UniProtKB/Swiss-Prot annotation:
Induction: Mildly induced by estrogen (17beta-estradiol). Coiled coil: none annotated. Pfam families: NAD_Gly3P_dh_C, NAD_Gly3P_dh_N. Its main location: secreted. NAD(+) binds at residues 18-23, 50, 106, 162, 294, 323. Keywords: Cell wall, Cytoplasm, NAD, Oxidoreductase, Peroxisome, Secreted, Virulence. Belongs to the NAD-dependent glycerol-3-phosphate dehydrogenase family. The keyword Ubl conjugation does not apply. GO terms for cellular component: cell surface; cytosol; extracellular region; extracellular vesicle; fungal-type cell wall; nucleus; peroxisome. Substrate binds at residues 129, 294-295. This is Glycerol-3-phosphate dehydrogenase [NAD(+)] 2. Interacts with human CFH/complement factor H; the interaction is direct and enables the pathogen to evade the host innate immune system. Interacts with human CFHR1/complement factor H-related protein 1; the interaction is direct. Interacts with human PLG/plasminogen; the interaction is direct and provides active plasmin on the surface of fungal cells. One of its GO terms (biological process) is glycerol-3-phosphate metabolic process.
Amino acid sequence: MTTSPYPIETPFKVCIVGSGNWGTAVAKLVAENCAEKPNIFQRDVKMWVFEEEIEGRKLTEIINTEHENVKYLPEIKLPTNLVANPDIVDTVQDADLIVFNIPHQFLGRIVKQIEGKVKPTARAISCLKGLDVSPEGCKLLSTSITDTLKIYCGVLSGANIANEVAKGNWSETSIAYTVPEDFRGAGKDIDPFILKEAFHRPYFHVRVIEDVVGASIAGALKNVIACSVGFVEGAGWGDNAKAAIMRIGIKETIRFASYWELFKIKALSPPNPKTFTEESAGVADLITTCSGGRNVKVARYMIKNNVDAFEAEKIVLKGQSSQGILTAKEVHELLTNFNLQDEFPLLEATYKVIYENGSVDDFPQLLEGDQ
């Protein structure tokens, strides 16, 4: 049994908001930890499920009786202490740690539903990938959660393909977490030790870092870059072209992060360039995502079959989301607002293919300025 270096009078209650492919995989490992560490966590882990019917049965009923998410994570047995719940308020109330794992376009609606319903001492972790863009600048999704719910939110991001994690194949991740002083106080701290105990498994290693901005930006932009990789795959250009896309993508990600103050991103400290090259949330996540994730698959299908992005998403993902499609638009809007399009030729070229009938054949010319 793991012993906390800090006294824990009442074990922490953990819940998961989201039950898609990645949401269920994360819920599985968290529930495993909660069952094994009763001195730190309460045993049962509620997982909010957007209710659907599968062959005449409610998805929550299937998960709770057969312990399998047959739609989003089939053929993976889930812990019996993972409880599917269709009521979002009931899921989060009284939770000490709330893990958000939903498509980022739904975040605003979800947090509004639970505003004022969560414990003021709760903490949150965002597994979402994306940015909240407005004419004034850019907000991290974790900051959006904090601003609405008035609880501190960190970020989990890394080279994590959901099915591999769910099968127990070894991988690692980054948790970016730095609690500001105004959120500290008696009974209010869930420290990095607790987070590591909640997420770390023998097959899922966790490194806790402080760079929330860097991890968030890398997690958002890698999905756009992965779309570019899918485009060149669809065009049949091979591994050399994919490597070039990833190199330019890393460079543009670091450049994007350097504008964090201009973009008015709230942060306790500036992004650390080492996050992008040394942490799982950086280059490792980019490599994994560009090696065959859903963004690559959708983008590849677009080019091979000459269909638009949303049609490809519907056909390939069957109801799930390709976050790169939406993020490409958000990033373009941000760069346009600050007149920075010319500094990000890859991100802009990707946007044009998705939204302006641009051609992947133009990539070599559009990226010439990066050389």
